[in-house]
Amino acid sequence: MNNLFKILRKEAERFGVVLDDEAVGNFSLYLEELKTWNKKINLFRRKNDQEIIIKDFLDSLTISKYLSPGASILDIGSGGGFPGIPIKISRRDLRVVLSEIRIKKFFFLKHMIRVLEIKNLEVMAASNERLEEFDFLISRAFGPIAKLVETGSPYLKGNGIVISMKGKKGEEELHQDHPILNKMGWTSYFVDHIELPIFEHKRILIGLKRDVSRETNFGMTSKIISIS
């Protein structure tokens, strides 16, 4: 195990994640596939392995403590697989579905699922199935919080939670979107400020849940189907 993965294993423990040898091996495989495919399609703009391991792998693991054991997770706008693939590598108890409409990135995710050979990891494309199926909706690069909730909430069970991974202006965005979220019947559940090591990379996790006393039918009506 090289020093970078030793750092990943140590820092992951800060977020309640214990990485065994199998998980570290899968992260190593994932790293190499990311770099290979990035030569063909634009998956990321990181400069080196250290940035990928800290700003992508470790960053993705910061939400793990909020995900209940055995939960079903939908990662919308997964792109290169973040945060869904690192979460699944580290938490084999979870069922993780990656949603990606950009065709090149979709096929990369399909490839990674075949390479990793991890059970209960799927990739989907936007369509019209699977309403009210998931316990958690997670996203790192989808866009405004209110848009994420509007787009993703139909996929969640009644008590489902949305977790949006934001940068340093996350709370400002939450405040701006509050009137829209309130109208849709959603309220903030938690706000967690995190600083990742080495790069002093700041992350704000924002959790939202339905306010059942104010819930409306505002939101999209399409669902998701498997293309496996």
Annotate the PLM regions.
Residues 77:
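Conserved glycine-centered beta->alpha loop in an early N-terminal alpha/beta scaffold
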Residues 80-93:
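Conserved SAM-binding loop of SAM-dependent methyltransferases across substrates and taxa
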Residues 5, 27, 57-60, 84, ...:
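A general structural signal for well-ordered alpha-helical segments in protein cores
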Residues 1-70, 74, 104-121:
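Class I SAM-dependent transferase core
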Residues 94-97, 101-228:
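S-adenosylmethionine
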